[in-house]
Amino acid sequence: MVPRLKSKYEKEIRPTLQKSLGFQSVMRVPKLEKIVINVGMGEAHTNPKAMEACLVEIGQITGQRPVKTFAKKSIAGFKVREGMVLGCKVTLRGHHMYEFLDRFINVALPRVRDFRGVNPKGFDGRGNYNLSVREQIIFPEIQFDKINTIYGINITFVTNTEVDKEAFELFQAFGMPYRTAGK
C-alpha cells in the first residue's frame, strides 16, 4: 500500500510546486530523498544498557534497525577513545521515509510541550532541513513508563534541490508547521 504522503506528493504537491516554481520538467520539482535520524549519547561508553535501550527505541520509532556510530578519533577532554560507541543512526528511504514523515508531522510534533512550530532557519544552504527533538517520548511508539533515559534526536531531511526556498515550499506543502515571525 502506498503511504498517504507519497500519494499526496505525486497527485497534488508535485504538480502544484511545478506550477508555482515555474519548472518545465517534472524532474526539476523538489523531492524528499531520505531522512536521517541520529542520536548522540554521551553516556554510551559508560552505560551500555542505555545504548541498548536507545537502539531498541529508535528501532521502534523508525521501523528499521539502527546502526551504532563510533568515534573516529580520540578526544581526551571528552574521555572518548577511537572506536568507542557514541550513538546510533537510521537512514529512511522509500515507504518508511514517507510513513515516518507523516507520523512525525501529524502525531509527534503536536505532542511537543509548548510547541509553536519548527524553526524555519534549519536549512543548510543546500536544500536540506535539520531539526532536533529534545525528548524521544513525543513519539507514540515509546512507552513512557519503560524508558530509563531521555535523550535528544537529530533529524535531517535530505532533498534533491540545492535551493532552500524550494525545499521550504516542499516541506510546507507536506504540512510541516513552521514557526511564524511573530512568535
UniProtKB/Swiss-Prot annotation:
One GO CC annotation: ribosome
Keyword Metal-binding: no
Top-rank lineage group of the source organism: Bacteria
Pfam families linked to this entry: Ribosomal_L5, Ribosomal_L5_C
GO annotation terms (biological process): translation
GO molecular function, one term: rRNA binding
Protein keywords: Ribonucleoprotein, Ribosomal protein, RNA-binding, rRNA-binding, tRNA-binding
SUPFAM superfamilies in the record: RL5-like
Chain ranges passing through the membrane: none
Claim: Ribosomal protein is one of the keywords in the record: yes
Family: Belongs to the universal ribosomal protein uL5 family.
Subunit structure: Part of the 50S ribosomal subunit; part of the 5S rRNA/L5/L18/L25 subcomplex. Contacts the 5S rRNA and the P site tRNA. Forms a bridge to the 30S subunit in the 70S ribosome.
HAMAP family for the chain: Ribosomal_uL5_B
Function: This is one of the proteins that bind and probably mediate the attachment of the 5S RNA into the large ribosomal subunit, where it forms part of the central protuberance. In the 70S ribosome it contacts protein S13 of the 30S subunit (bridge B1b), connecting the 2 subunits; this bridge is implicated in subunit movement. Contacts the P site tRNA; the 5S rRNA and some of its associated proteins might help stabilize positioning of ribosome-bound tRNAs.
Protein name: Large ribosomal subunit protein uL5
